[in-house]
Swiss-Prot record:
Residues 232-291 bind DNA. Disulfide bonds: none annotated. There is a cross-link at K82, K116, K178 (Glycyl lysine isopeptide (Lys-Gly) (interchain with G-Cter in SUMO2)). Pfam families: DUF3528 (PF12045), Homeodomain (PF00046). InterPro entries: DUF3528, HD, HD_metazoa, Homeobox_CS, Homeodomain-like_sf. PANTHER family: HOMEOBOX PROTEIN HOX-A11-RELATED, HOMEOBOX PROTEIN HOX-C11. Belongs to the Abd-B homeobox family. Sequence-specific transcription factor which is part of a developmental regulatory system that provides cells with specific positional identities on the anterior-posterior axis. Binds to a promoter element of the lactase-phlorizin hydrolase gene. It comes from Homo sapiens (Human). This is Homeobox protein Hox-C11. The lineage of its organism: Eukaryota, Metazoa, Chordata, Craniata, Vertebrata. Coiled coil: none annotated.
């Protein structure tokens, strides 16, 4: 295939087109063509480059040569004065400014929020929607340096109308909120008193160890005292093991005890008549609950 090719004619058009710069390619036939071989190995080290050293024409770019290098800082963090050379993209920036105004986020205030640099540039205002920095804006920047300006009204409401947060906010709402726990209304006190009385009654039913005289003495000051007076918790006096064993033995034989037997147990166990009576009442309620639980367990019907 290569034997029929005349390398002199193959190389001559390139010499005619490119002139004297490629004159040294005259030896390409001896270097590239071997009559005894089908394949050849080109030697490009002796061949000059096809492109001239200096570019023949300047390549035009759609943007200026003074385009700054790519930076990691986003557009919202940079002042608008540094982007004056991109005139072809002004419509995009105008659309962005319009969107920011639509969202109540002027470009200058956004930059002040993010960069906290008030004097880095002049004013950059949208021509259709000029704005002025509000008086309490710089105080709100201290309160909210991350969220947009639209969220500042929540902080202003928290501080009652903007400004630096005082040491003691003079808000009437906060004062009332603070005063409510200190002086709750009478209805709340009444409900608390009722709840305390119910809890005390339940405690008396479950733990009837306190004496009747002590219980009555504890209830009388509670009734006669002022509503906002602190309630004193009555002292718990659990039964001893010996007393519980004797009471359980008597309950095993007699669920309901008469007055004579009750007085006898009170003298023997060093208890009052009321304590023995309350213990038997609570023991009967406990036995009733246990029997109901046993019935539910063995019958398998939780509605019983």
């Amino acid at each position: 295939m290569f034997n029929s090719v005349n390398l002199g004619n193959f190389c001559s058009p390139s010499r005619k087109e490119r002139g004297a710069d490629f004159g040294e390619r005259g030896s390409c036939a001896s270097n590239l063509y071997l009559p005894s071989c089908t394949y050849y190995m080109p030697e490009f080290s002796t061949v000059s480059s096809f492109l001239p050293q200096a570019p023949s024409r300047q390549i035009s770019y759609p943007y200026s040569a003074q385009v700054p290098p790519v930076r990691e800082v986003s557009y919202g963090l940079e002042p608008s004065g540094k982007w004056h050379h991109r005139n072809s993209y002004s419509s995009c920036y105008a659309a962005a400014d319009e969107l920011m105004h639509r969202e109540c986020l002027p470009p200058s205030t956004v930059t002040e929020i993010l960069m906290k640099n008030e004097g880095s540039y002049g004013g950059h205002h949208h021509p259709s929607a000029p704005h002025a920095t509000p008086a309490g804006f710089y105080s709100s920047v201290n309160k909210n340096s991350v969220l947009p300006q639209a969220f500042d009204r929540f902080f202003d409401n928290a501080y009652c109308g903007g400004g630096d947060p005082p040491a003691e906010p003079p808000c009437s709402g906060k004062g009332e909120a603070k005063g409510e726990p200190e002086a709750p209304p009478a209805s709340g006190l009444a409900s608390r008193a009722e709840a305390g009385a119910e809890a005390e009654a339940e405690e008396e039913n479950t733990n009837p160890s306190s004496s009747g005289s002590a219980h009555s003495v504890a209830k009388e000051p509670a009734k006669g005292a002022a509503p906002n007076a602190p309630r004193t918790r009555k002292k718990r006096c659990p039964y001893s093991k010996f007393q519980i064993r004797e009471l359980e033995r008597e309950f095993f034989f007699n669920v309901y005890i008469n007055k004579e037997k009750r007085l006898q147990l009170s003298r023997m166990l060093n208890l009052t008549d009321r304590q023995v009576k309350i213990w038997f009442q609570n023991r009967r309620m406990k036995e009733k609950k246990l029997s109901r639980d046993r019935l539910q367990y063995f019958s398998g019907n939780p509605l019983l």
